[in-house]
Amino acid sequence: MFFKMLKEDIDTVFDQDPAARSYIEVVLTYSGLHAIWAHRIAHAFYKRKLYFLARIISQVSRFFTGVEIHPAATIGRRFFIDHGMGVVIGETCEIGDNVTVFQGVTLGGTGKEKGKRHPTILDDALIATGAKVLGSITVGKGAKIGAGSVVLKDVPDHSTVVGIPGRVVVQNGKKINRDLNHQDLPDPISDRFKELEREMEKLKGELASLSRKEEQS
């Protein structure tokens, strides 16, 4: 099973990266793949309570790949790190199958509390360059996190989140229009003029009514 996962990791590179040309190139030059393999070994030692050895492996991997993955983090099959440099994955992070992350991604905590404090990333999610997913939250199946986003709340399945803080803009293939366009922003001066115009029309009506009463008297 372990070696099957390693083979799947290689195949995933070919599936995800059109620049991959040969097995020898992928095995020798893809730092994201090296980081994943190192983590799988470190995690195996961590589960056997060989914590120090697991941390040594993860630190050596960090030095050579620029990717920091705590050996306690749980990572599923066919995980792909594209470019890799600057990726951080915290201790209690849980990642499902077929997940892709890009360079500069942080799956981190929001404080120094004990217990579950890092994100859970469900199957088929994609987290783009520089995104920060923080805290004990869940990123749903097939969700996409836009580049540079900061996500602090749960992300629904099959949705796209962008911005700081992250907000859902697409869910189940349908756009959610939560962005205020500049032309749609409220204009307090214009609103006040319109209110004054309504008051003037009301006063004109009252004056006209009084004039008619005086003429009739």
UniProtKB/Swiss-Prot annotation:
**Cross-referenced Pfam families, in alphabetical order?**
Hexapep, SATase_N
- One GO term describing the cellular component: cytoplasm
Which Enzyme Commission numbers does its entry carry?
Answer: 2.3.1.30
Q: Which reaction does it catalyse?
A: L-serine + acetyl-CoA = O-acetyl-L-serine + CoA
The answer, when asked if Amino-acid biosynthesis is one of the entry's keywords, is yes
Q: What pathway or pathways are given for this protein in its record?
A: Amino-acid biosynthesis; L-cysteine biosynthesis; L-cysteine from L-serine: step 1/2
A GO MF term = serine O-acetyltransferase activity
Activity regulation note: Inhibited by cysteine.
Q: Which GO terms describe its biological process?
A: cysteine biosynthetic process from serine
Compartments annotated for it: namely:
Cytoplasm
CDD domains, A to Z:
LbH_SAT
Protein known as: Serine acetyltransferase
Name the gene for this chain.
Answer: cysE
